[in-house]
């Protein structure tokens, strides 16, 4: 891999920022909000931001870049496809649970649904995401699609995946801001109480994680090498810094 130390730095940063984001989201709902529950009350709503950060942001981000981890190149391409799809499916399951929690809470409290830009963008991402997963499995995981078709569709697959991921980041930033505006009364959001500061930090962490994932996913020098090259790596002890595969990258990794 070219610039392996740089890749490792960005991946470690992304992982740390993502994990810290989850910790901050958990701290927010446990310390400043009503905790977690499943009774139609505010504690049920709190699953929404927490599971969105864990699933729709962190797990989706890791799923996007998992192909590019050099230590996975010793695994078969089919195995990595299964891991890639599995992470996306798990992220989607958590996202669905979080959306259900919101609707149950809103209906229990007679709060209108689907009126804000946050809800529109967020639901659009939730609807598009399974379509991306199903098409990805049909085209790339099930070995029946011609290689030429897979190669032709790969740019669209990559673009739509990143578009959905960025849309989720945008929806999350709108959502946590909306929650603070509605919830903080005395002191108000504009007075910057500790909860507001904490959640603003969460927003910055989410944005930073998204930026790091997109950067890692769009560096052509960090793509997974061709299958035959990856198999060669599994049979030698060449360090990632010494592996030069810039000219051997496929367009379908």
From Swiss-Prot:
GO cellular component term of the entry, any: lysosomal membrane
Residues in compartment: Cytoplasmic: 1-5, 68-76, 143-149, 221-253
EC numbers: 7.2.1.3
Ranges in the topological domain labelled Extracellular: 31-45, 104-116, 178-195
Cytochrome b561 domain boundaries: 13-218
Annotated positions binding heme b 1: 48, 113-116, 118, 178
Subcellular localization: Cell membrane; Apical cell membrane
Gene Ontology BP, a term: ascorbate homeostasis
Composition bias, Polar residues: 230-240
Textual note on the cofactor: Binds 2 heme b groups non-covalently.
Alphabetical UniProt keywords: Cell membrane, Electron transport, Heme, Iron, Membrane, Metal-binding, Oxidoreductase, Translocase, Transmembrane, Transmembrane helix, Transport
Residues bound to heme b 2: 68, 77, 84, 157, 223
Any one GO MF annotation of this record: oxidoreductase activity
Cofactor: heme b
Transmembrane segments: 6-30, 46-67, 77-103, 117-142, 150-177, 196-220
Annotated positions binding Fe(3+): 106
Region (Disordered), start-end ranges: 227-253
Primary enzyme class: translocase
Record-listed L-ascorbate binding positions: 77, 81, 150
The protein's assembly and partners: Homodimer.
Function of the molecule: Plasma membrane reductase that uses cytoplasmic ascorbate as an electron donor to reduce extracellular Fe(3+) into Fe(2+). It is also able to reduce extracellular monodehydro-L-ascorbate and may be involved in extracellular ascorbate regeneration. May also function as a cupric transmembrane reductase.
Name of the protein this chain belongs to: Plasma membrane ascorbate-dependent reductase CYBRD1
Originating organism: Danio rerio
Lineage: Eukaryota, Metazoa, Chordata, Craniata, Vertebrata
